[in-house]
Every structure is written in C-alpha cells, then in structure tokens.
C-alpha cells in the first residue's frame, strides 16, 4: 500500500546552460545548499543541470540562468528518479577523525555525524560546509552558546553540539528546515542542546559566543550588522558560502571585526572574525 504522506513525484530544477558556464553555475547551485547536481552534456554544446532546489530560491535560479545565457524550468519526475543521487552518496571528511555521513551510508571509523538532507538541503559534502565546520570547531568550546544562521538541515549545529557539547540555536527561512534540524538533532542524540528559533528580534544584542553562517555572499553582507549585534564582545563570527574573490567585500561589511582565520577550498572561502 502506498503511504499517502509520501509524495509520488518531486518537482526539480532543470537548467540548460552553455558548456563553458556549467561549472560556475553548478557551483552556485551547490552554494544554495542542494543535495546533488546532475550534469548531462547535450549535443548542441550545452549542459543540462538538474537539482532539487528549494522554491525560496526560484528568483535566484532564474537570474542565474539569465546571467549565464541559460534557461531554467521546473519538471516533475517520479521520486525514484529524483532520489537516484542517494545511491552515490558518500561520507565526507571534515578534519582529523571527524566525518559527515548520510544517514543511509555505512560510517567510516572515527567520530561521525549522521545527516538526512530532506532532499532540498546538502549532505555536508560541499566545500562551504566543510570549511565552516572545520573553522567553527577551532573556536567553539563546551559551554558556548552558538547560533547557526541559515542552518539548512542543521548539520553545522548538530555537529558542533555533538563534538563539543555546546548549545546551539538554528534558524533558516526554508519551510522544511525545522523538521530537518529536529530530525538530525535526534539522529545524533543532541535534541537537548540543538533548538530551533524563529529568527532574530529587531534590536537583539550580544547573546552568542559564536555565530556561524554558511550563506551566499550577498546575504552575508545584508545581515552583517544583525549577526555582529548578537555576538558577544570578544566573540566569534564564522562565515562561509562565499567565493575566494568575495572575501574582501564580505569582510568589509563586518565593520570593526578582525579577521583571525581564512580558509580556502576549490575557490570557496571561509572567514573567522572576532567582534571587538
């Protein structure tokens, strides 16, 4: 019998772009937090990219296609087709003995964080997630309070709490995020320390030892003042989701903060900032 709660089909993005633009467009899709990007070369010199993108990013995707001479459309496919990426999922090494592991994949030896991406979030295998987590692990300590802004599946908050004992709060505008956060927190035994919050209150000040945000660069700039405001004096802001050539612009938006660490991976970057 078919479970009525389980959809029979997914609506996924299909984006056709010139072959020369495929890599940068694919990187941009990964930056939106997708779980996978399928690339299919076409005979006319173009490439079709397919991904399960949150409807919240529809305008971003249309603009991305326009900017690179491509066309975006949404197609409906059976769940069995949309989920084929799961068969190719692998554990992702973060640092030391720490691994991020999809819930259905055999875990390697070491400290593992299990992740269920809920089909619209990443599995933790994108460089921006690895950069953010490795940088945050260097500054987060037991007893700290941490905000994961733009949390997606909650992988950063869950991992930080499980590995350090810190208390985390999570927020994301995606409607599926809360369920994903609560599922992954329970999956890793940290439901008592990882909590959902509805957003930042206007005028909110200085509540967190560490703020982590793995979001695209324009958004990091837009919310800079709010993130700094909720960080305790002497606290830390860890930023990821930006390209290497965007670091100066993003850092400049965090007025008065000093850069204490910068990491690079495949053209992506993270910044660790100290609030005065």
Predicted features along the sequence, with ranges:
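N-terminal auxiliary segments of SAM/dcSAM-dependent transferases
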Residues: 7-108
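Conserved beta-strand segments that form the floor/walls of ligand-binding pockets within enzyme
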Residues: 12, 99, 114-116, 172, ...
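General small-molecule cofactor/ligand-binding pocket signal
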Residues: 73-75, 101, 169, 195-197, ...
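SAM-dependent Rossmann-like transferase core, predominantly class I methyltransferases
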Residues: 82-142
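Conserved SAM/SAH cofactor-binding pocket of Class I
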Residues: 119-200, 204
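S-adenosylmethionine
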Residues: 173-276
